[in-house]
Amino acid sequence: GRLDARRTLKSLVADLRFITLLSAGAQKNIPASDIKVAMMKATRFMVEKVSNRGGYLWNYSPDFSRCWGELEAKPSMIWIEAGTPAMGNVFLNAYQLTGESYYLKAAQAAADALIWGQHSSGGWPYMLDFSGETSLKQWYSKVQKGYIHCAQEHAHYYGNCTYDDAATYDSGMFLLRMYLLTLDPKYKYPVERCLDFVLESQYPIGGWPQRYPLHYEYVKGDKEDYTSFITINDGVHTNNINFLLACYTLLGETRALEPLQRAMTCVLALQGGKPQAGWAMQHKLDLNYSPGHARDFEPAGYAATATAEMCRNLMRFYRWTGDTKYLARIPDAFEFLESIRYNDAQMKQLGKSVKPGQILCPTFVEVGTNRPLYLHNDPDHYWVDYDYHGLITHYSSTRAIDLQSLKDEYQHLLSLSKEEVTKDSPFIGQTDISGTLLSHLMRGKMQQADTQKVDSLLTILKKKDYLPGRLPSVSKENPGFSNAPLPSEVISIKEYMNGMSTFIQYLTK
């Protein structure tokens, strides 16, 4: 109930105010003070030279003549996807390590940018433009005319929100973290609006579209607009379950419980029948929830990665509930993955190898036949066929699947009693998992750190104010925003975040 939630929240606040700094007594080759000076130097540059009203793109020319999100952007824009909320989390990690208020202020500025850009429906798009929607529509117009092989999700202006690439999820979770840290209601309100959005956009079956509010106008040839399909790709279904769980567990939002349970049973409903007992990246809203297409290089078909992800989810749901219905058809999914795996001769033909315990599978297999589908393009269009020669390079036609680890986890669960399985359940367990969930929420992905890596970063930051990166190939086409030459290196928020993560990991190991 809410009383328990309030108790939990009080304990979380206590945890949040307890800053763990292990560097003081640890034996290290590099003084902690040197690392902290470098962290602050790199952060000040990002906040004072790079930030736009608290928000960030991905890459910038060293002279700031050009800037990019996933694609080239206007200076008035900031990126949500892998951008502003991710930077905010790095600032909070640094704040909770060092106690330096500068990092908290940087995180608050990022949060303010996200609050400014929250859609009226409660979610977020891929990017924001502080110059307004007219300016953003002009950007889309240039992208449509200027990019040949652009990221197709940016080829049409919808004016709505997206779950793709965790844009809405990352924003909502970062603002939830801000609220738990500060208890400032200015951060709770947008989290509640985000929860409203997640609940409103959920289909009765329990899944979510890629975008919401729903639009259907972007039809290409004989392919309907895919953004209304139930989406598993890029973690949409998993992320929304995680967000509902966080709201229920950390905020005591009981209205999240029934939608969460529906989302769990939706995974069962979407699984194909034998011999194709897998999942697709998108499922249509027809009677069979059949696989649906997405971008031109994402055909309708069953997908190995989606299947592995849903198997892990089902095992997680079993831990939460102790209900064996979540385990019942996992062996069918394993059988499906085994049936589409490449043998050694085929992997040699493809020039691929895998690690021990992994299998190599096609990214997509054809509905009804299990034949691998391969992805191609030329300057004018994409196509899909059965020929593994001449494949596109920006999106792989094959995927490595950790099948053995899935099987091991499944067998381990079978060996446990129901009481053992559910001991950490957020619903029926005897253990308060809020601290574990909060830790996951707080830390994010941490980089492995060693003395050599840290020393290399420190050397760079003695010469520069930033950690340089390279412009990714998808960003190199010029849709006409600038005639300035492409830089040999860029100011990269990815390199900044990786570097900060390395420093933090080193100081806390």
Segments the model singles out, each with a brief description of its role:
Residues 1-10:
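N-terminal export leaders
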Residues 14-20:
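Bacterial N-terminal signal peptides
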